[in-house]
Design a protein with these regions (language model features):
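Acidic, proline/glycine-rich low-complexity intrinsically disordered segments
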Residues: 1-278
C-alpha cells in the first residue's frame, strides 16, 4: 500500500485503493498520484475516489513522470513510452540502442523535453529527449535518477548514493557547470532507483542507507517488542518456525549487499547457526 505524508506532519495517510501499488508519481498539480498496480498503470485522486486504469504495463516499468499537458511518460524495457493520463494505449517515443536501457524519466517545465538515465556498458549517465523532434541527446554527465529544479539545476545520484546538483540549461539541454554535492548515503538500488523525492523549488527528501544495519525484534500482539537475539546486521525476509521457537533469516555480509547467507536464530537457547556459506 502507498502512503502520503505532508512534510509538516508526523503521520502518513494511506492512499485509497493503493494495495500492492509501487513506483508512485504525482500529477503536475499534485492532486493525483499514479502508480503501478499489478500489470497496469493506474491513478487515484488524493481527495478520494476510485482507482482508474491508465494503460497496460505487462513488462517492467522504471519510473514515470506526469506532464502539465496531462500526459504520462514512463520507462519500460522498450524505451520511453507515453500515454494520455485519461487512459489509452501507450506508445514508444524513444528506443534505446543495443546494449542500452532507459530509466527514471523527469519532464522539464513546459513539457518540451524529458530528462532520463541511460544505462550502457557499466555506465550510468544523463540524457534528454527533445519531444518536438524525437531526438535523444546523450550527455556525458554521470548520474542517475535526474530531477530538474526550476532554479536551473538537475539533481542526480551516483551509484554510491551521493546526491549532487549540476547547473543545467533547460533550453539547450546542456550541463553548464560542475556537480555540487548535496548529501550522501542515499538508499539506492542496482537499477538506479533512489529513495529520493525532489520538488521543483529544490527541496528534497530521501531515505538514508542503513549503514549501521539493524536488529531483528519480536513483537507480540500487544505491540511489545524484544530483541530476537541477533547482532547488528543487514537482514532480509525473516520467517518464524511453526512452533515459534526459531527464526530463519537471510543476512547480507555488508552494506554492499553483494553476498548473503541463511542463518537460524534459536529464540529459546539464544544461539545463532549459519546454514549456508555462499
Amino acid at each position: 500500500r502507498l502512503y502520503v505524508r505532508g512534510l509538516d506532519q508526523l503521520d502518513p495517510v494511506p492512499v485509497p485503493g493503493s494495495d500492492g501499488g509501487i513506483l508512485p508519481f504525482f500529477s503536475a498539480d499534485g492532486q493525483w498520484v499514479g502508480f503501478r498496480q499489478g500489470n497496469r498503470l493506474v491513478k487515484v485522486a488524493l481527495a478520494g475516489g476510485p482507482v482508474t486504469p491508465i494503460c497496460d504495463a505487462t513488462g517492467d516499468t522504471y519510473g514515470a513522470t506526469w506532464t502539465s499537458a496531462d500526459t504520462i511518460i514512463f520507462a519500460s524495457d522498450s524505451g520511453l513510452m507515453d500515454v494520455p493520463a485519461a487512459g489509452g494505449i501507450a506508445r514508444v517515443i524513444a528506443r534505446p540502442d543495443t546494449g542500452e536501457a532507459f530509466r527514471w524519466p523527469d519532464v522539464l517545465p513546459g513539457g518540451r523535453a524529458v530528462l532520463f538515465t541511460v544505462f550502457a556498458r557499466g555506465t550510468v549517465k544523463l540524457a534528454a529527449l527533445d519531444r518536438r523532434t524525437g531526438a535523444v541527446k546523450r550527455l556525458q554527465q554521470p548520474g542517475a535518477y535526474p530531477r530538474y529544479v526550476t532554479a536551473g539545476f538537475v539533481v542526480l545520484s551516483d551509484p554510491s548514493g551521493i546526491i549532487s546538483a549540476v547547473p543545467f540549461d533547460a533550453r539547450r539541454l546542456e550541463v553548464t557547470g560542475a556537480a555540487m554535492p548535496l548529501a550522501d548515503k542515499v538508499s539506492t538500488a542496482s537499477d538506479g532507483d533512489r529513495n529520493l523525492g525532489v520538488s521543483s523549488s529544490g527541496d528534497f527528501a530521501y531515505q538514508a542507507n542503513p549503514s549501521a544495519g539493524s536488529r531483528l525484534v519480536l513483537v507480540d500482539r500487544n505491540g511489545a517488542a524484544r530483541n530476537a537475539g541477533s547482532d547488528t546486521g543487514f537482514y532480509y525476509a525473516p520467517r518464524l518456525s511453526p512452533d515459534g521457537k526459531r527464526v530463519a533469516v537471510a543476512r547480507w555480509a555488508d552494506i554492499n549487499f553483494a553476498t548473503r547467507d541463511v542463518w537460524v536464530l534459536d529464540l529459546v537457547q539464544h544461539t545463532r547457526t549459519r546454514l549456508t556459506f555462499d
